[in-house]
């Protein structure tokens, strides 16, 4: 097994007492919430953005091209995420807070730069770099929370941490509804600079956790050493399934609603607003799933069985929402009714992994392991939006394409058994 070289004998694990757990939680939560806000804006203003940028790039604006290029740009953004495994290793080596600040600066500035785009290529480059920054925030922030709060609060706060994502998505939808038509899509992207101000607070108020291996210099290859490799690959496979499923299902809800209503004669601006409403409703379910996650895992007493529940729930909710409500019944009202259930399972499942994933790795590999699992997941997940756009263009139906690709949750079930059961165990040093 590969050895992890340390610069001194390890000190006992000490939880900081100079900073309240609540302050650490809210600082981490705020970073992830603004992260969600920046990443979600695109799905709410997709139609308006491509309506301007496609002609500027010599591409016709039509239903098929919006699907194809919209999916391609989603995938480019997620490839940026996929390249962000560097941040997790850096957080283990150089500190959680320092690296978290750098990731926030990268994604906030390059999200704002998207508003300066004059064509598809420039926009894609900015989205890729923004994705690179966003992908690293989780790998630094989640270990920071796990290692900085008392054990008796850790699972509860970690489960609630993912409420930041639906809150960010909710805020993005709300801002789109309130000022999207006034600011336009460029103005919406300019708002992405706001998270940069969070770094001032982080650097001044949040210390590095006093970890047992504070002086360790982890080798990235230790993730694949004997005794660790199965956990690493199982975690990566599970993240791949839920990321692919998420980006292939509920993040398309605003676009499905907007394109369906625009095809029925509604103005693009009004259809975009209704798409934002769909996002708001979906996020209500996501928020509920995250809030209940610590309770659900406690009642089931197993991280694995909780994962099985949410994988199967995700599959059923995707098929019910898209195949039954949209494809068979052609009923937008029923679709809106099912959206909270869709959000509860497909996005709420991430609340489980804010608890489970950091528990799978020792402290010196926690950032690298979390970062690798998410990055690997994003590599596969990046194919989801492109496949949705391509299959939808081929079949002439977003709902059919989305339902077909929801089988990813079935593929993921065997990997749950390969991941370690960490329920009722203290966080490993």
List the model feature ranges, each with a label.
Residues 82-118:
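Conserved MFS/SLC helix-loop-helix module at the cytosolic interface between two early adjacent transmembrane helices
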Residues 83-95, 289-302:
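Helix-to-loop junctions at the C-terminal end of transmembrane segments
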Residues 161-203:
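Helix-loop-helix hairpin linking two adjacent transmembrane segments in secondary transporters
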Residues 1-44:
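Cytosolic juxtamembrane N-terminal segment immediately preceding the first transmembrane helix
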Residues 43-44, 229-287:
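Extracytoplasmic gate region of multi-pass secondary transporters
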Residues 105-118, 312-329:
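C-terminal ends and interior cores of transmembrane alpha-helices
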Residues 46-84:
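Extracellular/periplasmic helix-loop-helix junction of adjacent transmembrane segments
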